[in-house]
């Protein structure tokens, strides 16, 4: 059975609130670290989220 191309990642808020989202990404199409603006409910505004490994 072949290994899948998708891996689970955690998107951590850069506002240092401790809030995070979990998602998955295709590591063949996106080899770099993912950065995306998403809503942080702790500070109630859109902030930058950066990729981190799920432990």
Swiss-Prot record:
Record bears the keyword Ribosomal protein: yes
Highest taxon listed in the record's lineage: Bacteria
GO CC annotations, alphabetized: cytosolic large ribosomal subunit
Gene Ontology BP terms: translation
UniProt keyword Nucleus present: no
Alphabetized InterPro entries for the sequence: Ribosomal_bL33, Ribosomal_bL33_CS, Ribosomal_bL33_sf, Ribosomal_zn-bd
Keyword tags: Ribonucleoprotein, Ribosomal protein
GO molecular function: structural constituent of ribosome
Family statement drawn from the similarity comment of this UniProt entry: Belongs to the bacterial ribosomal protein bL33 family.
Full protein name: Large ribosomal subunit protein bL33
Source organism per UniProt: Aliivibrio fischeri (strain ATCC 700601 / ES114) (Vibrio fischeri)
């Amino acid at each position: 059975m072949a290994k899948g191309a998708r891996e689970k990642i955690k998107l951590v808020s850069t506002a240092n609130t401790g809030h995070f989202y979990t998602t998955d990404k295709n590591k063949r199409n996106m080899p770099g670290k993912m950065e995306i603006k998403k809503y942080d409910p702790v500070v109630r505004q859109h902030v930058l989220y950066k990729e981190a490994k799920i432990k």
